């Protein structure tokens, strides 16, 4: 469990910065999502994709910033919870990228 307030703030800031990059990334990368992955709902697909991508990057950032070993226990559900706290911003960023 992440108990250090400065680490938690740093993770929130990192996730916020990462979310701000998403619209440009979508415009440059995901040209025909429905054709490539044959998904029904593009917004839902990209939401799941970015939650996973941000979760992985945040875990890497956390391990790097705290100099923790990869063998140490880090609760990925806690990281996902931090991401979900910003779900509205994430959904808005994806919608902006899809316009």
Positions of the model-derived regions?
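Amphipathic alpha-helical binding modules
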Residues: 69-99
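A generic structural signal for well-ordered alpha-helical segments enriched in polar/charged residues
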Residues: 17, 56, 60, 89-92
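Amphipathic alpha-helical segments that form the core helices of the histone-fold
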Residues: 36-39
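Amphipathic protein-protein interaction modules
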Residues: 41-81
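Short terminal alpha-helical segments
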Residues: 1-34
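Long, hydrophobic, amphipathic alpha-helical segments used as structural scaffolds
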Residues: 22-26, 30, 34, 58-69, ...
């Amino acid at each position: 469990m992440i108990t250090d307030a400065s680490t938690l703030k740093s993770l929130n800031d990192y996730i916020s910065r990462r979310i701000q990059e998403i619209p440009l990334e979508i415009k440059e990368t995901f040209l025909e999502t429905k054709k490539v992955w044959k998904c029904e709902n593009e917004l839902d697909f990209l939401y799941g994709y970015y939650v996973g991508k941000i979760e992985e990057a945040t875990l890497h950032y956390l391990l790097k910033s705290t100099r923790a070993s990869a063998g140490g226990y880090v609760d990925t559900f806690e990281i996902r919870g931090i991401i979900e706290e910003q779900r509205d911003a994430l959904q808005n960023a994806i919608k902006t990228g899809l316009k």
